[in-house]
Amino acid sequence: MAQFCILGVLLILSGTHCSWGFHEETHYPCAFIDTANITGSYGLDGPFVHNWTVIPRHFVAVYDFVIENGIRIPASRHLRACVCKTKPCVRICCLRGEIYDLEKRQCLVPVAGVSSLPSHSHMEVELGNGSLRLVKLQPRFSIHVETPCEHMKAVTKGSEYVHWTLHENGTISHRGHIFSKHYCFTPLLHGNSTWEWQPLACAPEKLYFVLGVREWTYAICLLIAILSMFIVLMVYLMCSEMRNSFYGVAIKAYAICMILGYALLAYLTLHNPANLSNAACRILPSLALMNLVLSFYILSFIAFKLYLSFYGVVFTKLMFWLIFTPIVLVAVGWSFFVGFSYYGSRLIFGGDTCWFDPRNWSVMIYFYAPVFVACAISGFFYVLSQIYIRDQPDIETEKSFESIEKNRFKSFWKYFGYTAVVWVVCICSFAFNYYWENRSHLNYAVSFCMAFHGFAALYALIGKNQQIQNFLRRIDNGEDTCENSVPLSSFG
């Protein structure tokens, strides 16, 4: 068991404090929002030419990142120029003939029956002398047609739109208040009759931390599962007949993984991500992922060994660790990879949530997919075992497959079936929550399944295991159990 503790400590020590919140580097000539990708633009001996605009070389830099939805993400090296430094920029959300729909959060063609849209080529601008004039945009401004963020919102005063003024220098203001650079213009209906150009601001979808009855129920059910797994661990540690067997060691390793994984999930559920450091918000979920994924591959390892038991294969201590160590390293490597990977423009761990973001499908790819692979491997060996049992005469089967191993086989697969049901419920619950836009991994079905998982471990791994039951009877009768201790030379 010391080896498992060492592996956990090594993973913690390998985590590094990586602040992923974006800040502008001082060696870039301007803010990212003021730049445009000019890769492929014509470069003279001195300046560059982009969209018929001459850009001095000191406004050009090589970037190895882009910013999407306010988040900096790595990108291939490319040239960007401060086009808004050369000519004031005006950002329009959608192409000609389209408007940005605030409810559907995308560019759409307006429904028929409304008045025609205002021209994209002209807009009312306040000139330097203070006068307002409808001017053609192209000669005076660099026009960008895009939304700077995935979700945009209108800035209103009460329920009324604010009349923002576009200035000749590209700024937008209202009574001394300057609008953010992260904006785009779109026509919006004013009074259900006329269109008015309105700047929209970035509205990132914030996933707020909630600690309610549902979260506490989930945490309590996880605690029940943890206590159940702890009982399984203690019983298998005390049982001399199980202590040094392959099956006993594997079950103990599995119980440790489940205890640590569920404990970390409970901790993350009850703690606001805003109160955790960036490093903690990356390392803790990575550790939880490692333990949970590793637990499923331990079950696959047990299924493999139970199948080999039909052929009388006995694992030595060296064989056990030669097979088990790569499994641990793969789980550690996978969790480390996920902890520093992006899903779309967001880090998988960190930000609004310190677990998988329920607003996307990252949990299906990085958690449930490897779990499914482990279950498929286990199922494969279960099918092979059943084929072997079916093909053997009843008498020969009893001779070649000892009753102890047969009992382990039945109790293990009973528990595996319960485990599969629990995680199928978790997957289906997430899919339903996602479909109904309930941005959470949790519901009461998931919570109660966690408690059921703990009770299933007690029932199948202790209640249905004949060796454990015999050991508990000897304990109850006050018999000495140490005399049956087996040296750790081979794993049966």
Swiss-Prot record:
Transmembrane regions listed in the UniProt entry: 219-239, 246-266, 283-303, 318-338, 363-383, 412-432, 442-462
Disulfide bond positions: C30-C82, C84-C89, C93-C184, C94-C107
Keyword list, A-Z: Cell membrane, Disulfide bond, G-protein coupled receptor, Glycoprotein, Membrane, Receptor, Signal, Transducer, Transmembrane, Transmembrane helix
Signal peptide positions (record): 1-21
Membrane topology designation: Multi-pass membrane protein
Subcellular location: Cell membrane
Coiled-coil boundaries: none
Listed GO CC annotations: membrane; plasma membrane
Protein's GO biological process: determination of adult lifespan; G protein-coupled receptor signaling pathway; response to starvation
Any one GO molecular-function label of the UniProt entry: G protein-coupled peptide receptor activity
Pfam family, one: Methuselah_N
Residues bearing glycans: N37, N51, N129, N169, N192, N275, N360, N438
Spans within the Cytoplasmic topological domain: 240-245, 304-317, 384-411, 463-492
Extracellular compartment residues: 22-218, 267-282, 339-362, 433-441
Annotated PANTHER family: G-PROTEIN COUPLED RECEPTOR MTH-RELATED
Recorded family membership: Belongs to the G-protein coupled receptor 2 family. Mth subfamily.
Protein name: Probable G-protein coupled receptor Mth-like 8
Source organism of the structure: Drosophila melanogaster (Fruit fly)
